[in-house]
């Protein structure tokens, strides 16, 4: 399923987001030995913030062109079309998350750290995140 397909599914059925976010929050509050050490999701920083969890909340920021290049590398396609599709997806997601939860994923309020990853490769992003986790 592509990002666009998933976005369309979520737009048509808000229950998809509600169920996924409920599962995500369940995992975030676990304290057993099998609890996840790292959780990645567009809203995980928000949920950790709203749940009052004392944990690093990291937002990876990338510019529109770099985001499109990464999608292109993963899924193929025309770069200009991907830029347009990403903008449309972001607009739809903003409307959906505002309707569901009254928040926008890209608002930086809940995040303890923001990494501009536009000029970083995957290994550099990982190193930056590990540095934050080791210091926390």
How would you label these PLM feature ranges?
Residues 8, 12, 55, 113, ...:
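Conserved short-loop catalytic and cofactor-binding motifs
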